[in-house]
Amino acid sequence: VPLAMTPLLGLLSQPIGAAGMARMPLEVQSLAVWSMINGLGFLIRSVGTAFNEVVVRHAGDRGAERTLSRFALVAGLAGSTVHLTIAVTPVGAWLFRHVGGLSPSLAAVAADAFLFAAALPILAWLMSLWTGLLVHARRTRAISEAVVLFIVGTAFVLVLGAKLDVMPGAIVANV
C-alpha cells in the first residue's frame, strides 16, 4: 500500500464504525452522539496528529529524537488529561448538553463513550512521533502495514462487540 493511500485507508474506519455501532446495544443513541464525541475528541488530539510534520522536519537535528519524544509524551499526557477532565467533570455534561445540543439521556451516553477514548490523545502524539521518525528514516512500509492492521483490528473489535451485544456501540467504537 503506497504511503499516500494511508490517510484514505484510515478514513475507512468511519463507515466501519458506523456499521458496527448500528448492530450493538443503544444503536440509535450511539449513532446520535458519535459525531459529537468524535469531533470533540479530534479537536483535542488534532495538534498531536499534526506533530508528525514537526518530527519529519526535525528528526535529523542533533538530540532531536530525545527532545521530540519527551515533548510528545508531555503534550500527549496533557491532551489525555484535558480529555479525561471533560469526560469526568461537569464540563463534559455542559459541552454535550449546551454546545452539542444533546438531550440529558444522550449526553449521558456521550459522556460514557467519551471516557473510554481518554487514551487517544497521547496515542495520537506517540503515533505521530513514531510515524515521523519512520518517514524521516525512509522506512514507510511499516506505516502502511500499521494502517491496514488498524482497519482489520477495528473491524474485529466491532464485529466482536456486535456479537457479544453487551456494550453500547459508541463505547466499543472508542476502544
Residues covered by each model-derived region:
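Short membrane-interface helical motifs at transmembrane helix boundaries
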Residues: T81-D112
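Hydrophobic/aromatic residues within transmembrane alpha-helices of membrane transport systems
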Residues: M5-L9, G17-M21, W34, V55, ...
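Helix-loop interface residues and adjacent transmembrane-helix termini in multi-pass membrane transporters
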Residues: P25-V28, R62, H136-A137, K163-L164
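Helix-terminus/linker motif at the lipid-water interface of multi-pass membrane proteins
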Residues: A4-L43, R97-G101
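Membrane-interface helix-loop junctions in multi-pass transport and translocation proteins
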Residues: Q29, T89-A93, R141, I151-V175
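Transmembrane alpha-helical core residues of multi-pass small-molecule transporters
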Residues: N38-G41, A75, A146-G153, A173-N174
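Small-residue-rich hydrophobic transmembrane alpha-helices
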Residues: V33-I86, M127-V135
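Alpha-helical transmembrane segments of multi-pass membrane proteins
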Residues: S103-W130
